[in-house]
Curated annotation (Swiss-Prot):
Conversion of NADPH, generated by peripheral catabolic pathways, to NADH, which can enter the respiratory chain for energy generation. One of its GO terms (molecular function) is dihydrolipoyl dehydrogenase (NADH) activity. The keyword Transcription regulation does not apply. Coiled coil: none annotated. FAD binds at E36, R37, Y38, H39, N40, V41, G42, G43, G44, C45. The lineage of its organism: Bacteria, Pseudomonadati, Pseudomonadota, Gammaproteobacteria, Enterobacterales. GO terms for biological process: 2-oxoglutarate metabolic process; NADP metabolic process. Transmembrane segments: none annotated. Binds 1 FAD per subunit. Its main location: cytoplasm. Gene3D superfamilies: 3.30.390.30, FAD/NAD(P)-binding domain. This is Soluble pyridine nucleotide transhydrogenase. It catalyses: NAD(+) + NADPH = NADH + NADP(+). GO terms for cellular component: cytosol.
């Protein structure tokens, strides 16, 4: 690479995508700078998204577990915790993550520049520092990894003290008794679980006809039932007409004519790429209506020396995938091509209470494709480990080809689902005939474990064959 630039490459953003790219580049001997607009590294994933919401969920789920455990159910020892207490737990996790990630950059001699960056020309960025000064930095190549933020429709007053998005909800100052969540996607469903777990009344407004329609229908139905059973009110096929902030809460007027009132509103319907401040018009790059950039298989934009990874390119918008995209882009940036690529079947983890996780095809997809598949199921309530820990709600479902025994999809609903799924994923990724449901019958599992669900489900499925 040329040394006439300040850096060989500049990475914009220090979230999972930016970190993956920066670490991948510096390990290949590239002179790298990472630009971060906030005081701490980690991006939205660490500070407002994945990490804090999962820390909240964990704290709430442990409270639920304690209160539902028959050992402690004499009603005189019910655990309670305020939202503020649980947020303090999330803050401690964020601080640990930030400290650890800062160490990655320091150990690898990767320079971090703090401030807001925008393109002046195809190789120059203007950096507005926190003290108000502006400096320019140049590089031969760039990786845009600036992430996304919650979508804000113009007719919703997000300055009102009772109207929140998925970022600002982490600064909730009062103890709500009733919350409206608008948008029943992954974020909306996760927060519905958290608030209901804290005994807050929840109205979940879904603009579609079922929850998380990309999931296998049984998993979606299981979540709907679990929400219904815990007291979450789900309203499908609804859209807001007007959102009205009042002194003591929020009134939502729906297009169907209904009205709802609650202490606060969490608006969780869509996200937009953080590209509007990059002055991409100065270099001729265009985004779509959601602020996202188009890239090729090597994560190059329309300008071959500028790459983009993570939420800013859209699907799959997962922290796990963003890190891998960053590593792949780093390899392509240095070598001209990348030997690595994203796996075809990216696992999905949804941190509701209980969790949902899946990898591979759904029953609906396989039916539409006319693939002759069979189903193997294991109910958690029949597993010794689940009985011991009092986690009997849940199921593991394996979809496999009737003739070849190849595993086509795995779907799990229940506590630790996002961990359990990876056992099956490891077998699904095997080549040369290694992907077979018979592996789970022919191997020995520790006992008692949740992993044993795979043996139970495999036997259940194979017994259906004739």
């Amino acid at each position: 690479m040329s040394h006439s630039w300040d850096y060989d490459a500049i990475v914009i953003g220090s979230g999972p995508g930016g970190e993956g790219a920066a670490m991948g580049l510096v390990k290949q001997g590239v002179r790298v700078a990472v630009i971060e607009r906030y005081h701490n590294v980690g991006g939205g994933c660490t500070h407002w998204g994945t990490i804090p919401s999962k820390a909240l969920r964990h704290a709430v789920s442990r409270i639920i577990e304690f209160n539902q455990n028959p050992l402690y159910s004499d009603h005189s020892r019910l655990l309670r915790s305020s939202f503020a207490d649980i947020l303090n737990h999330a803050d401690s996790v964020i601080n640990q993550q930030t400290h650890m990630r800062q160490g990655f950059y320091e150990r690898n001699h990767c320079e971090i520049l703090q401030g807001n960056a925008h393109f002046v020309d195809e190789h120059t960025l203007a950096l507005e520092c926190h003290d108000g000064t502006v400096e320019t930095v140049t590089a031969e190549k760039f990786v845009i990894a600036c992430g996304s933020r919650p979508y804000h429709p113009a007719d919703v007053d997000f300055h009102h003290p009772r109207i929140y998005d998925s970022d600002s909800i982490l600064s909730l100052q009062h103890e709500p008794r009733h919350v409206i969540i608008y948008g029943a996607g992954v974020i909306g469903c996760e927060y519905a679980s958290i608030f209901r777990g804290m005994e807050v009344k929840v109205d979940l407004i879904n603009t579609r006809d079922r929850l998380l329609a990309f999931l296998d229908q049984e998993m979606s139905d299981s979540l709907s039932y679990h929400f219904w059973n815990s007291g979450v009110v789900i309203r499908h096929n609804e859209e807001y007409e007007k959102i009205e902030g009042v002194d003591d809460g929020v009134i939502m007027h729906l297009k169907s004519g209904k009205k709802l009132k609650a202490d606060c509103l969490l608006y969780a319907n869509g996200r937009t790429g953080n590209t509007d401040t990059l002055a991409l018009e100065n270099i001729g790059l265009q985004t779509d209506s959601r602020g996202q950039l188009k890239v090729n298989s090597m994560y190059q934009t329309a300008l071959p020396h500028i790459y983009a990874v993570g939420d800013v390119i859209g699907y799959p918008s997962l922290a796990s995938a963003a890190y891998d995209q960053g590593r792949i882009a780093a390899q392509a940036l240095v070598k001209g091509e990348a030997s690595a690529h994203l796996i075809e079947d990216i696992p999905t983890g949804i941190y509701t209470i209980p969790e949902i996780s899946s990898v591979g095809k759904t029953e609906q997809q396989l039916t539409a494709m006319k693939v002759p598949y069979e189903v193997g199921r294991a109910q958690f309530k029949h597993l010794a480990r689940a009985q011991i820990v009092g986690m009997s709600v849940g199921t593991l479902k394996i979809l496999f080809h009737r003739e070849t025994k190849e595993i086509l999809g795995i779907h799990c609903f229940g506590e630790r689902a996002a961990e359990i799924i990876h056992i099956g994923q490891a077998i699904m990724e095997q080549k040369g005939g290694g992907n077979t449901i018979e592996y789970f019958v022919n191997t020995t599992f520790n006992y008692p474990t949740m992993a044993e669900a795979y043996r139970v489900a495999a036997l259940n499925g194979l017994n259906r064959l004739f």
